[in-house]
């Protein structure tokens, strides 16, 4: 098995453990679930923080790939492409309890900071879609930087606090609700 396949497998099992235990799972538990030695695990990731850092990249790279497919799909009406782009969550991550991400802030602040930076990046194609819809008068004139800030701040708030967990709202449901509220607020 090649190195990337091993890393992907490790991240998938780590994702499953994260879903089950949050960030509190141990590298021993991960190695056991993978049926590999901890020593082998550390060949791929220096520590749990490194694993989480790579997992953030893996998730956001998957989201970026999914967004690209949506944006270039001419069979989807433009307004629907905006909605789908804003609420995209690849199938392999639908089961993750993103509500637990707020726990990373204290224990793994560098990972959390990296997550925040990734959340704020790769907006170019979404912004192009919004601008196009404004030019076509399908969306009213509004400040795209304010729109982006509202969206990012809401998601960061979900990650920073346990508001979703406390109110028994899943991350995908919250994401759909946010997009619905935002889109209904900017539609002509």
Q: What label would you give each PLM region?
A:
Residues 9, 13, 17-50, 54:
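Helix-turn-helix
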Residues 140-161, 174-185:
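Hydrophobic alpha-helical segments that form the core
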Residues 2-13, 78:
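N-terminal positioning helix adjacent to the helix-turn-helix/winged-helix DNA-binding module
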Residues 120-148, 155:
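Hydrophobic alpha-helical bundle segments that form small-molecule/ligand-binding pockets
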Residues 91-127, 135-136:
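Short secondary-structure transition hinges
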């Amino acid at each position: 098995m090649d190195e990337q396949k091993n890393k992907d497998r490790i991240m998938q099992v780590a994702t499953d453990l994260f879903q089950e235990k949050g960030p509190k799972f141990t590298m021993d538990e991960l190695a056991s679930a993978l049926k590999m030695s901890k020593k082998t695990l550390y060949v791929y990731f220096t520590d749990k923080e490194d694993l989480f850092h790579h997992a953030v990249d893996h998730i956001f790279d998957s989201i970026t790939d999914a967004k690209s497919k949506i944006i270039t799909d001419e069979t989807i009406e433009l307004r629907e492409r905006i909605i789908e782009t804003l609420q995209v969550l690849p199938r392999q991550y639908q089961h993750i309890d993103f509500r637990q991400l707020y726990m990373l802030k204290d224990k793994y602040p560098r990972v959390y900071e990296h997550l925040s930076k990734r959340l704020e990046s790769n907006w170019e194609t979404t912004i192009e879609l919004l601008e196009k819809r404004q030019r076509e008068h399908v969306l009213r004139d509004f400040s795209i930087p304010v729109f982006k800030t509202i969206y990012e701040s809401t998601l960061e708030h979900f990650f920073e606090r346990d508001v979703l967990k406390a109110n028994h709202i899943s991350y995908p449901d919250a994401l759909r609700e946010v997009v619905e509220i935002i889109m209904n607020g900017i539609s002509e």
